[in-house]
Regions:
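Conserved alpha/beta-domain cores
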Residues: 1-198, 204-206
Length: 214
């Protein structure tokens, strides 16, 4: 996230629009999620004043310290959890976030579903796919993504709307994004959260609906 806030946001939005127009692929619009981890509360204000409303946070505790006060001033903020979630943080996550992008195992799915039932919320959720099958990364195996997503719906009652991935560092991202798009079609999960600062234009070419830029 750049210190020259309005210019940085405008530049990214223009690149997103240009990529979308160039490739002519669905969806109708690509959503920019500004990755705000490590930035303090007041550092967010210029982005909010410049019109940015979608933000991604990696840690529940950090988000708790930052966003409640900002939400009182900017009530239309949409907050996405894009980092790993522990089951003992499910209650806090459901209370604070609007979208959960990192559902990757049954224990988390059940913890989220249980808390949503308790408070009467139904948050949109993404299945996180370990698209490169990397040992150090979270996410379900690509071969299990479709069945896991269906299980999240049928057994846990989650509202699975899409898939999310982070491709391997140093590898051309296009084939991984294409693979995620194919899995999303099979899973009947129309939203695709893929693409970050260095590769979001490639992700848009493959059908990304959400890009995460920080």
């Amino acid at each position: 996230m750049d210190t020259d806030t309005p210019h940085a946001l405008l530049s990214i939005r223009e690149r997103i629009k240009a990529a979308h127009n160039r490739f002519g692929a669905p969806p109708a619009e690509v959503q920019l999620i500004a990755v705000s981890k490590t930035f303090g509360r007041e550092a967010m204000v210029p982005y909010l004043e410049a019109g940015q409303r979608l933000f991604g946070e990696n840690r529940v505790q950090e988000a708790q310290e930052k966003w409640p006060e900002l939400r009182a001033r900017f009530p239309d903020i949409e907050l996405h959890l894009i980092g790993p979630l522990q089951s003992n943080k499910a209650r806090d996550a459901v209370a604070l976030f609007d979208v959960i992008q990192t559902v990757d195992r049954d224990r988390i799915a059940e913890a989220l579903a249980s808390e949503m039932r308790r408070v009467g919320r139904s948050l949109p959720c993404f299945v996180q796919v370990n698209i490169g099958a990397e040992e150090q990364k979270a996410g379900v195996a690509p071969s299990e993504a479709v069945s896991f997503g269906q299980r999240c719906r049928d057994e846990h009652g989650l509202n699975i709307v899409g898939l999310m991935c982070i491709p391997p560092d140093g590898a051309p991202p296009g084939p991984f994004f294409a693979h995620l798009a194919q899995l999303a079609r099979e899973a009947e999960a129309p939203l695709l959260s893929m693409g970050m600062s260095g590769d979001f234009e490639t992700a848009i070419a493959m059908g990304a609906t959400h890009v995460r830029v920080g």
